[in-house]
């Protein structure tokens, strides 16, 4: 069983993948997307779901700090529907509050340059989202 973890932004889509046992998440890549133009990287996601035989997708679900759903959360809900229809696998919306900030702090503490952080931040956020989900299953 492999699970794909996604962190949806307006310009990029961070992608992570679980190991076959469902214990750990590894960053795969960051896909450039154009949310305004309706390009969500579905062609590349189709390749990944086929290559890795994905059973489930965990999509980061950004909520406001008070628990309400804002515009980014609504975009994630719509994207989840598209993913389910396109790939015919269950999509789990996972609370991702502060995941990007936590990934940023982790990269800063590892002394990763600002230029390098910009390239990997969404992939790292996807790892944190997926790992949180996997940990909840295995606890």
From Swiss-Prot:
A Gene Ontology CC term for this entry? Answer: cytosol
- Family assignment? Belongs to the YqgF nuclease family.
EC supergroup of this enzyme: hydrolase
Subcellular location as annotated: Cytoplasm
Q: Keywords assigned by UniProt? A: Cytoplasm, Hydrolase, Nuclease, Ribosome biogenesis
Species this chain originates from: Bacillus licheniformis (strain ATCC 14580 / DSM 13 / JCM 2505 / CCUG 7422 / NBRC 12200 / NCIMB 9375 / NCTC 10341 / NRRL NRS-1264 / Gibson 46)
- Under the GO molecular function aspect, what terms does this record hold? nuclease activity
In the UniProt record, does the keyword 4Fe-4S occur?
A: no
- Quote the function comment for this protein: Could be a nuclease involved in processing of the 5'-end of pre-16S rRNA.
Q: What is its EC number?
A: 3.1.-.-
> This chain belongs to which protein, by name?
Putative pre-16S rRNA nuclease
């Amino acid at each position: 069983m492999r699970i794909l973890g996604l962190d949806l932004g307006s310009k990029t889509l961070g992608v992570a993948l679980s190991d076959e046992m469902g214990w750990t998440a590894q960053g795969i890549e960051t896909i450039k997307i154009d949310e305004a133009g309706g390009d969500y990287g579905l062609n590349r996601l189709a390749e990944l779901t086929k290559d890795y035989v994905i059973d489930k997708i965990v999509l980061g679900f950004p909520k406001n700090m008070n628990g309400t759903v804002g515009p980014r959360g609504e975009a994630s809900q719509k994207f989840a529907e598209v993913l389910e229809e396109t790939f015919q696998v269950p999509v789990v919306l996972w609370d991702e509050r502060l995941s990007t900030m936590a990934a940023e702090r982790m990269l800063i503490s590892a002394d990763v340059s600002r230029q390098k952080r910009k390239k990997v931040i969404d992939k790292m956020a996807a790892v944190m989202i997926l790992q949180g989900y996997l940990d909840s299953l295995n606890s």
